[in-house]
Amino acid sequence: MPNVVIIGAQWGDEGKGKIVDLLTRDTDYVVRFQGGNNAGHTVIVDGKTYILHLIPSGILHKEKICIIGNGVVLDPQIFIQELDTLLSQGIDVSPNRLKLSTKTHLIMPYHKLLDQVRENASTTQKIGTTGRGIGPCYEDKVSRIGIRTIDLTQPKLLYKKIELALKEKNTLFTQLYNTEFVNAETIFNEVMETASRILPYLSDTSSILQDAFIKNKKVIFEGAQGVHLDIDHGTYPFVTSSNTIAANASIGSGIALSSTEKIIGIVKAYTTRVGSGPFPTELYDNTGKFLQEKGHEYGATTGRPRRCGWQDLVMLKDSVRLNGFTELALTKLDVLSGLKKINICTSYAYQGESVTYPPQDEHILFNEIKPIYETMPGWEHSLESCTSWNQLPQCAKNYIERIEQVVGVPITIISVGADRNQTLFRDI
């Protein structure tokens, strides 16, 4: 298997964790390259559920090496909690198997506080942040006042960096948001309490990956969130704080762009979104509730109910353009079972015309476009016992083939249930 980048093709929650888990069987390394614990990847193995926020899904496979790259922002306490949870489940998370970049930035307590007070103070436009401190951490990274994992090795320097960061933060907290002054020593002590658990994992992960490529090892790059949450190319400002598209696999892990050969987009059979932002095909009726309940559409990170809607091929084609997907994996096809009719959005109505691309202005996407649907017949019986393409109902096959026709990319993996073995592989 060639080196593969796995990207969520919608607004996140597409089922990337399951697909990464499946493909890990044929790989040697699994790499997280962006985002933080605002992402939740759910993997079900033999009826047992694992929810991973920071550690790559490949950790569930023995002898696979997992890497958290420089593009990730890491909450020390959440990282340790995740380690302990996996240990309690009998999973090997030793430093021999899990590597953490020395360049990874740390989410500090003041980042989480700033995230929360900002969202609470907003009266006009709430982004729907998870409040995990992801955005403020990336802000400090760009402002060159961030704290990196390597700083844990030099406590005196770390303390000075915390003091520097808090000069501005405390002005914001006390004068703009009317919250309490944050003490540098308190923050320092809290962070240093985690150092002994984190330091053994620190590695030059870029060099490790380069060595892996030289030895012809196989690598999966595991994306978080989804294309349309990308800070540059998503539905701004209702986006995350990092680049979620495939090109960032190179930057966020410290490897050459030419190191990746296959890019797989993960797309749900319908569309979901968490938090605020444009959602052209959103359903407010009983069908939307049907998808939400049958699909268990509640966030793995926040528990918030996900907004649900029909498949949007306009947005999916945009994802194909931005990432250069070589193939797609379609998840949760089984959720559509029982619907007599299934709508699929192939274009938007805008100013009396039919357009097949998303408007760049989020106001237009929010208020001025209407989805144009094709209606396809649904299917009644469950798909969960299907083990091959030939066993799928003809209407389900037609649905899959119509998606392929419109976006121009083959669907090679089809998920028909939550468990690892409820997956069909299709040679095209």
Curated annotation (Swiss-Prot):
The protein's annotated pathway: Purine metabolism; AMP biosynthesis via de novo pathway; AMP from IMP: step 1/2
Cell compartments where the protein resides: Cytoplasm
EC code: 6.3.4.4
GO cellular component: cytoplasm
Active site residues per record: 13 (proton acceptor), 41 (proton donor)
Reaction catalysis annotation: IMP + L-aspartate + GTP = N(6)-(1,2-dicarboxyethyl)-AMP + GDP + phosphate + 2 H(+)
Residues binding IMP: 13-16, 38-41, 130, 144, 225, 240, 304
GO biological process: 'de novo' AMP biosynthetic process; IMP metabolic process
UniProt keyword terms in alphabetical order: Cytoplasm, GTP-binding, Ligase, Magnesium, Metal-binding, Nucleotide-binding, Purine biosynthesis
Entry cofactors: Mg(2+)
Cystine bridges: none
Chain positions recorded as substrate binding sites: 300-306
Domain of life from the UniProt record: Bacteria
CDD domains, sorted: AdSS (cd03108)
Entry keyword Metal-binding: yes
Group of enzyme by EC: ligase
Residue numbers binding Mg(2+): 13, 40
Subunit structure: Homodimer.
Record's protein name: Adenylosuccinate synthetase
